[in-house]
Amino acid sequence: MQLSATSGRTSFRVSQDLRTGPANFLSGLRDDDSLLRQVFFSILRHHHPNLAAKVDVIYALSQAWCTSQSDNDFELMVKYVSDLKPEERILVASSFSHMLNLHNLTEEVNSSQIGRAVRLGEMDSPTRDTNHSLLKLTTTNGFTPQQVYDTLCSQTVELVLTAHPTQALRASLLKKYAIVRRELDTLHSKRMSEYEKIETLEAIRAAVQAAWRTDEIRRSKPTPQDEMRSGLSYFSTVIFDVVPVFHRRVDTALEKLGLPRLPLDRALFKFGSWMGGDRDGNPNVTAETTRDVVVLARLEAVNVYFRQVEGLMFDLSIWRCSPEMKELAERLAAAESRDAARVAEERKRRNYVDFWAPIPPTEPFRVVLAHMRDRLYNTRQVLHQCLIHTHMSVRGALEEAGAYVDIEDMARPLKLMYDSLMSTGDESVANARLLDLLRQIRTFGLCMMGLDVRQESTRHTEVMDAVTTYLGLGSYASWDEPKRLAFLLGELQGKRPLMPPGMDMSPEVKEVVRTLRILSELPGDSLGAYIISMAKTASDVLAVVLLQRETGVRPALRVVPLFETLDDLHNAPGTMTTLLGNDWYRGHINGVQECMIGYSDSGKDAGRLAAAWALYETQEKLVEVAAGCGVRLVLFHGRGGTVGRGGGPTHMAIRSQPSGTINGHLRVTVQGEIIEQQFGEKEVCFRTLDLYTSAVLEAALDPPPAPAQEWRDLMSLLATESCDMYRSVVYRTPEFYDYFMQSTAASELGRLNIGSRPSSRKSGGIETLRAIPWIFAWTQQRLHLPVWLGIGEALEAAIDKGYGPVLQDMYANWPFFTSTLDLVEMVLAKADSRLSAFYERTLVDSSLAPLGQRLRELLAKTQQNILIVVRKSVLLEGNTPSQMSTPNLDEKIRLRSPYVAPLNVLQALSLQGLRKFRDGGDTEYNPSDPEIIDLLSRDPHKKGEGAQHPFVSAMDDCLMITIKGIAAGMQNTG
């Protein structure tokens, strides 16, 4: 049977077998890809019939080349694309970008279908989940159910959302694509009438058409407040609702083992944020910015709790209750009855859904909930005032108004209601929406996500130097480490104030101090950790402890050193030995120390393999140092989304950590496009929570065995060899920087407006470039150099020395090594030497061509040696543990490739055109068609006096669209 949905001049069909069972998910993926491409082409033909024909030809040419890999087929595609007019290039780029994003939706739906089939028992799970972990630990590993229960109840995963500029898609498009994803999933998962199917297809068409008519390019840079609002949208639409659903699933799994539910006061997850708190290298994050985002997050929390409480007022109409509940309700009702008319009028003015009049004590739950609703409303009003009047102390204003400041003020009456319902035998009512709200309160608090503050270590040194210089004590910046430590510890153990009022300050020093003073005026639960980036010494930590005391930050934020470069990672154990060896400091931290390890800068500094091994060894040594000092260490993993910045499948990434470094508590960043990939939809969010929970549980009870000494020794040799090779190319090859800047879009990425932070810390070479644009640029150019450079030579050297069998044994039996090579293999499968060579041919000075040829030879060598170690004939052959989290990965990459290749060609041509024009080249391009002029005039910042030449506008837009499209094709940016 086939169904036809017709709109305007076109029609498209969907085969019934798209919605059959899970017998062939790969076939379903191809069918979904074909369906959405068909829908898109029907829209394109409706609006641009001539252009649609050209897009169709380019897609066919790209498919032919991706299949044959022949130079002739490639040149045919290049020739056809090169002949496009500038305005056609924009629309063709946009077409392929949209088709890639639509294809990605089919992959997400495919994953959801597989997950659903697993839960129905129709197929084995390709990844671990909490239910499987509970069964495995109790049946296979020999742990008692009580041991597993106690471990689960004590573990916490904290996911810290960051605003790193790696989400290339606009929120406007994400919302439309979410509709397509939902409706496509509906086609698969529901029994539908013929009319319902047609209507669902029309809904898909409407969303795709709206997306096509939406400008893909973000025309102005987002502010940190914009980034926070974007992050909060995931909570209000997805995460807040999924958390209690996931806890219910865990409760059910526990009950199947004869265990009780999770305790009411336990939260398996906490959420944090860097949005508006990360000021490292971002001048747009000011003290006022930090204040704003805290207020915005609290407003979001109050709004969602308000809706939940109002819903409970309809649910809990019950009259029977415990004596304690009755006493509270009568007391609140009596207070209201003294001014009943005013209460009713005020509630009516507030436009509540219902329950305006004072509620009688015979409905005790509603009495208490009405009081909570009033207080939430008041809290919201105060927070609105704080946004308007920026001079107000947020904490002071909330306390003065009697608004909610402490989450326990909300939790206590709700817990009383729960206990009351349980005592009267109304367990089912207690364990419905009320239990969900209790779980949400324990997870999100009143802050939704606690804000970390991050600042670079030298900024604190500047403040301390200003203080000591003003006091006539000398220059703190020139002191050696022992003198700094002696001074800081002396001040911390004394009681005198250090910073005199009216002290002269530079603007930079003033901003650091102003930030700390703002923190002192914010509710303590809204703040998380104070992260010190580029931390190198114990004094870096103590300086922040002292500055918090001097500025009145109470309670003080825990101070977390971030070790990022290879040298800093190697020196971290010594730094922490000095710090934790101090009696005063150990007492100050109450026996718990958090350290952050950075995956991004270490990889950029030393290469992927050397960084991975340094991170592994550093974690082991930090745990050992902390244990020796009687301190519990919490490791905060600063992972990025890409493999080059520590990204990878969640479960395998956690299970490959050194034994004893997780211990039931994981704190990890969720960056950029990964937020959408992990929390963009409820089914996906549920799976994300499931993976983290099961992985941390298994890491605590069933950690991987320690690697054999022979493996460690060989790994150290590999790390040294790969680091030397990586640095010799990146930092010691004089022409490398020029090749990088010419062959990639690195210098143009800053105009993409995907984040508030600049792409470089300061002007200079590779050293000053941030890790994100460094990875982003090579990803776009398809060489993916930061991920693999140095690894092929290191493996080859080891194989030549006879270590091939040892490497194969390491790969088969050591999760860390398995995960590392599998992720590199996955990236190698996305690399494309032919396209990279086209960038070089089009953009790079011929004198640099030998370097490009050498890099491509190194890529081929890496692919060859990886295949030897993993015992495969082609990349991604079979299902390895790391790749099992993405079933059919090789086929998915093949399906994406014909969409990506034209975008790479268009990007190289756009860069060529822009650079020639800016170097003084001339063009006769001067369109007169009003529709084309309108297309080239979408940027409001480039009109009037700021108007660009139409050719530059066309190439600029084409470039920006290709950057976004290729990011979608690679499924990551930086």
Curated annotation (Swiss-Prot):
It holds the Pfam family PEPcase. It is found in: Cytoplasm. One of its GO terms (cellular component) is cytoplasm. The active site is at H164, K604. InterPro entries: PEP_COase, PEP_COase_bac/pln-type, PEP_COase_Lys_AS, PEPCASE_His_AS, Pyrv/PenolPyrv_kinase-like_dom. The keyword Lyase applies. Disulfide bonds: none annotated. GO terms for biological process: carbon fixation; tricarboxylic acid cycle. Optimum pH is 8.1. It comes from the Eukaryota. GO terms for molecular function: phosphoenolpyruvate carboxylase activity. PANTHER family: PHOSPHOENOLPYRUVATE CARBOXYLASE (PTHR30523), PHOSPHOENOLPYRUVATE CARBOXYLASE 3 (PTHR30523:SF33). Exists as a homotetramer or heterooligomer. Through the carboxylation of phosphoenolpyruvate (PEP) it forms oxaloacetate, a four-carbon dicarboxylic acid source for the tricarboxylic acid cycle. This is Phosphoenolpyruvate carboxylase 1.
